[in-house]
């Protein structure tokens, strides 16, 4: 559903931020 899609996108964004901070 829509909620699941939003959760997936938030996970991707969060992962990108973590990667950016670490590097």
From Swiss-Prot:
Expressed by the skin dorsal glands. GO terms for biological process: defense response. Its main location: secreted. Keywords: Amphibian defense peptide, Secreted. It comes from the Eukaryota. It is found in: Secreted. One of its GO terms (cellular component) is extracellular region. Signal peptide: none annotated. Has no antimicrobial or anticancer activity. Belongs to the frog skin active peptide (FSAP) family. Aurein subfamily. This is Aurein-4.1. It comes from Ranoidea aurea (Green and golden bell frog).
């Amino acid at each position: 559903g829509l909620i699941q899609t939003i959760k997936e996108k938030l996970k991707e964004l969060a992962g990108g931020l973590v990667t950016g901070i670490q590097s």
